[in-house]
């Protein structure tokens, strides 16, 4: 008697063989990377994973990344997200809250995400108004006028903050930038165990 279950299939060459259950390959993880206020060095280090990127492609779909997709909105149900950079603009603030809400494991990716690092150096200069006055007034040589309208450029926050000061972080991956081997060591167990 033939099985009517579409997930079971007997051997058509030997009808006496019992039907075998077909197994689905494990679902791929949904991986994202985000670039906030930083230099993109962490993403360049991610690309230094070289041949392991092929294995990564078997384990995960990259659903959002400035270096691997042109998607404009952060998707729902992301398993792992590497967040590069500190939070320094109004857009960064909106995005990091959305990332945390839609991501199972959020990784602070590199020193700027962990401590605000180089972008955070402006925090000691008296606030964003003082920084802009110096940049566009005191030291400007060509255009010594502060722009009145920022247009499509997001509003700068008064300070650049590390990610953990705004949302919970699940894993810290230090380095400026973290090495490719360190990135792999952080991702590999998560991709297999989540």
Stretch-by-stretch model annotation:
Residues 6, 12-15:
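Intrinsically disordered, low-complexity tandem-repeat regions enriched in Proline and Serine
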Residues 8-9, 24:
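Low-complexity, intrinsically disordered or signal/transmembrane-proximal segments
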Residues 14-194:
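Iron-sulfur-associated redox domains of electron-transfer enzymes in respiratory
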């Amino acid at each position: 008697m033939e099985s009517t279950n579409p997930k079971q299939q007997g051997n058509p060459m030997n009808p006496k063989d019992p039907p075998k259950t077909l197994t689905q390959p494990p679902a791929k993880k949904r991986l994202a990377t985000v670039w906030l206020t930083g230099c993109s060095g962490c993403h360049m280090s991610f690309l230094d994973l070289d041949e392991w990127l092929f294995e990564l492609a078997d384990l995960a779909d990259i659903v959002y990344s400035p270096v691997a997709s042109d998607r404009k909105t952060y998707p729902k149900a992301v398993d792992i997200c590497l967040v590069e950079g500190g939070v320094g603009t109004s857009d960064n603030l909106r995005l990091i809250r959305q990332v945390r809400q839609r991501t199972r494991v959020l990784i602070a990716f590199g020193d700027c995400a962990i401590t605000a690092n180089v972008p955070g150096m402006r925090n000691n200069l008296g606030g964003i108004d003082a920084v802009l006055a110096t940049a566009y007034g005191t030291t400007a040589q060509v255009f010594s006028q502060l722009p009145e309208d920022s247009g499509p450029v997001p509003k700068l926050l008064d300070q650049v903050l590390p990610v953990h000061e705004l949302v919970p972080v699940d894993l810290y991956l230090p380095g400026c930038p973290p090495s490719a081997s360190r990135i792999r060591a952080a991702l590999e167990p998560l991709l297999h165990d989540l």
